[in-house]
């Protein structure tokens, strides 16, 4: 075998080992539970090309990787028990996680409805999607 082929084989082995490590890490990390819902393959996500506005792209990345100020995340830093990380925005006694923020919090219902009205035409059976399917489509 040529040196080039050996280098390629070695590179493929290293890449596959890393992908296996990546899959194990995202599926066994509490911090990455939300990320696992929509990220299944080790490849560049299409939203990186679709969202041109840098601020919007950064905001979406922060939600996707749990680099945000929601209580589900900030509670980790100050050791608030998981079941006590309530939404300070609506004060409904509900854990403030990504699902609550994106889909349920009543304080965000108007912008959420405006957004849904804009995107509904892009999805078949939008109203029939489960919360997980909706998050997967939106994120």
Regions found by a protein language model. Name each.
Residues 3-139:
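Family-specific functional microsites
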